[in-house]
Amino acid sequence: SAASDVYKRQVQDQVWNRVTINRNSKKNTRYYIDEFHLLLKEEQTAAYSVEIWKRFRKWGGIPTGITQNVEDCLKSLTARTMLANSEYLVMLNQAPTDRIELAKLLHISDNQLSYITNVGFGKGLLKCGNSIVPFVDNFPKNTRLYQLMSTKPGEIQEILG
């Protein structure tokens, strides 16, 4: 909706203001954007997101886009450029069409693709600079840290009681 788009732009403006204030105080600003693909649907928020990606680092900002399914991002030339220029990516299990597009965009080998093909939780690929490496994270579930980090609805309900 139009109101939602205005709200998104206002949030982005506030974030940029915070980055500017923090830069003047010699502080870094971490900006986590969940459901990132929603910002790509509207032309103005998509363009602003590109500016954030391009300029934040120079200002001490560290943007992080989070999305469950990369398909929406891969449909957008803007987002494809952002992905290709990102220093650090975490890729978990991917749909077949997404794997093909990611392989082309990021130069992922067939062997590496096996780490994001029909894999379980905690397995995937890390892209850091020009390196792409597989990872397996079998984080112990019986820890307080796991409870704090879990995003699985059933586990959250269990933790909250």
Which sequence ranges carry the predicted segments?
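Conserved P-loop NTPase motor module
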Residues: S1-D5, Q10-I21, S25, N118-G161
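Conserved P-loop NTPase motor cores
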Residues: S4-I116, K141
